[in-house]
Amino acid sequence: MIAGVSAACGLLLAASGVAHAEVEPGGWSSESPGFKVQERGCGEVDDLTFKLTCSTASGDQRAERRYDTYTGGTHQFEGYFRVTSMGGTRISLKQTFNDTDGDAGPYFMLAVERGGRLYAVHGGDTLSNAGTVGATVRVNTVHQVGKEHRTYINGSLKHTVDSPGGSFYDKFGAYRTGSGNGPATVEWSNVKFWRK
């Protein structure tokens, strides 16, 4: 009996070290990249609450976390967001940003319109209509650097785009797109990162 309990405890301990990614399971290691808070224009950050307090439709209006740069490999982001107020529209929620010399700039941007439409800023593809005020939405991005970038909404694959090689980083929060404006408040939770 004691041997059986010891074996069971050993299995539990071994299992607790496994990094369980919500999509595309297998072979992931959890990681905790550092980040910097970015507040510009009327952007305000309070832990995982991100606000654009103005209706300005020009200039740099952002409230975000910018995570450390990665190069090569496969990286998965997961987070849950809830739009708690949306007086504006076309607010970017999650970005994968190219940090490669000569190619730096937004590579993938997930944004929300008033009414709940979630879309890819580059190309305009609709990913979901789940981003309504008050709804909690899970976002996963899987980025195989040099191959492709995949976006999942509530566990379902919704968008795939080819990826160049180089260096990238993740951002999330609330950011006015070129055709957008606030005000808006977005709460994020349960943010996790993995790599393989």
Locate each region found by the language model:
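Surface-exposed loop/edge segments in extracytoplasmic proteins
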Residues: 103-108, 125-129, 156-161
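Secondary-structure transition/turn motif
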Residues: 51-58, 121-127, 153-157
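Extracellular glycan-recognition surfaces and repeat-rich motifs
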Residues: 28-49
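Ligand-recognition surfaces built from glycine- and aromatic
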Residues: 22-24, 69-81, 86-99, 162-196
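Secretory targeting and sorting signals
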Residues: 1-21
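Short, aromatic/His-centered strand-loop micro-motif at the edge of beta-sheets
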Residues: 23-31, 114-140
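Secretory/extracellular carbohydrate-interaction modules
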Residues: 43-45, 49-115, 195
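Localized edge beta-strand/strand-to-loop motifs within extracellular or lumenal beta-rich domains
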Residues: 134-150, 154
